[in-house]
């Protein structure tokens, strides 16, 4: 399966989504900012983008289910949200969870709750 979930469409998330999409991967992006979702669709950097509060466990589980083997959590600036999303994705059964972190402490916490890889862009 080459389906990727990108959570967050800030600069880092847009760059990740665009790279995956250009390389023929199926990309679903989740973002709470409507303007960023519209831009992603308009610039054709994803297959689909959905406006969603990703910290809403019920909504996230409904959309993600078990359709993705890799998720990239690109919301490093909001530590609480990145931790919560990572934990939910792990509970859903996403095998590979790559998370953006802004510091070593955040990275350690993300690994404890389920991140398989932490990046510090």
Regions found by a protein language model. Name each.
Residues 1-121:
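Cytosolic regulatory regions of ion transport systems
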